[in-house]
């Protein structure tokens, strides 16, 4: 089969012929990839930022946002059958450890992360687990929802954490209206009554945010802090949901949050630099967000089937992966990049 593999950090990916994955365990599921989402994490992987944390050996196949059709199943799989359309939760959890029992799939003590620490979905086929596949509504196609497996899952996971502080009359600032942010806006609109303020340097992204139901669009041109202060009566927002986490976003977010506010960190790339006395005196809470749970993904698919969440995408054939990554890195993508294998 074909797979786009990383052979050396900072190099372009290569389209290789590799052996097909095989069923080895009773809960294994092999998915024929219909679409794979392109994530900024894939750029960070290419740059070597995940090398030490993942411990993966090169060459390997990235790709952690995947959807397609069940190709083959292990002997104990009962929740899906060959031919079913599925979206793949990006993490394979054991289901038996303490975090799994608590519903914290992403912190499984025995888990693995296809596309991060083992071969992922930039390929014709992907091996995953019965615990990771969500059967899709018949009206949903892989190319339309693949990136929800991480981008959407991460967005809804953060929004669900913020629900308790986003009651009527509250305000939330969304930093970044791109691949993750535009999904987060829709989740906020569907799940909370909060007033949504979106900050982004791109007028196209802000126009999309307006279409998706955001209340205020603020151009990140140097005046954003002053404008957000005016929109929040000088007090700041109850919550910041930061889908950028670099290029000055953290500093902006800290300036836009009200006392006793909650800062949800999703994007990454720079450090959180704030004096501890400010954290204490202002009672600001910083909350990290790593993807989401299986149940989060199931709920997101329900919202999608109801038409409350729509993924805006640009598609590329798998063999054009380096063009797609260049477009992502250059800020030319609106919404999410989607790779389509020739076998889809």
Q: Can you say where each PLM-predicted feature lies in the sequence?
A:
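Local beta-strand N-terminus motif with an aromatic residue
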Residues: 83, 123, 169, 214, ...
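Mid-domain Rossmann-like dinucleotide-binding core that forms the NAD(H)/NADP(H) cofactor-binding site
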Residues: 138-222, 226-227
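Residues in the short beta-alpha loop(s) of Rossmann-like NAD(P)-binding domains
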Residues: 202, 269, 292
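Rossmann-fold dehydrogenase core element
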Residues: 262-264, 274-314
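Glycine-rich cofactor phosphate-binding loops and adjacent beta1-alpha1 units
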Residues: 163-168, 207-287
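NAD(P)H dinucleotide-binding glycine-rich loop of Rossmann-like/cofactor-binding domains
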Residues: 55, 92-175
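C-terminal hydrophobic helical "lid"/dimerization subdomain
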Residues: 32, 251-255, 294-344
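Glycine-rich beta-strand-centered segment in the early N-terminal region that forms part
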Residues: 21-36, 50-98, 132, 137-140
């Amino acid at each position: 089969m074909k797979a786009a593999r990383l052979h050396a950090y900072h190099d372009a990916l290569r389209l290789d012929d590799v052996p097909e994955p095989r069923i080895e365990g009773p809960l294994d599921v092999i998915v024929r990839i219909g679409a794979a989402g392109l994530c900024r994490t894939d750029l960070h992987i290419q740059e070597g930022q995940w090398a030490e944390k993942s411990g993966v050996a090169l060459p390997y196949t990235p790709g952690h946002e995947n959807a397609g059709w069940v190709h083959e199943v292990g002997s104990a799989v009962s929740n899906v059958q060959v031919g079913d359309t599925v979206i793949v939760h990006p993490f394979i959890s054991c289901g038996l450890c303490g975090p799994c029992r608590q519903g914290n799939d992403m912190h499984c003590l025995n888990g693995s992360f296809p596309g991060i620490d083992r071969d992922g979905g930039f390929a014709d086929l992907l091996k995953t687990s019965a615990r990771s596949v969500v059967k899709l509504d018949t009206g949903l196609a892989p190319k339309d929802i693949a990136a929800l497996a991480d981008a959407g899952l991460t967005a809804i996971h953060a929004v669900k954490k913020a629900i308790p502080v986003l009651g009527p009359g509250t305000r939330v600032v969304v930093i970044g209206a791109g691949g993750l942010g535009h999904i987060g806006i829709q989740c906020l609109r569907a799940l909370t009554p909060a007033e949504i303020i979106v900050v982004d340097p791109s007028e196209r992204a802000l126009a999309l945010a307006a279409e998706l139901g955001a209340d205020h669009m603020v151009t990140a041109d140097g005046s954003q802090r002053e404008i957000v202060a005016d929109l929040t009566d000088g007090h700041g927002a109850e919550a910041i949901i930061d889908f950028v986490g670099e290029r000055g976003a953290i500093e902006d977010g800290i300036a836009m949050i009200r006392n006793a506010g909650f800062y949800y960190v999703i994007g990454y790339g720079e450090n959180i630099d704030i004096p501890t006395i400010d954290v204490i005196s202002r009672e600001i809470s910083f909350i990290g967000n790593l993807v989401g749970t299986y149940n989060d993904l199931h709920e997101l698919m329900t919202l999608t089937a109801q038409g409350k969440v729509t993924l805006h995408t640009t598609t590329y054939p798998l063999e054009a992966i380096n063009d797609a990554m260049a477009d992502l890195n250059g800020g030319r993508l609106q919404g999410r990049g989607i790779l389509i294998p020739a076998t889809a």
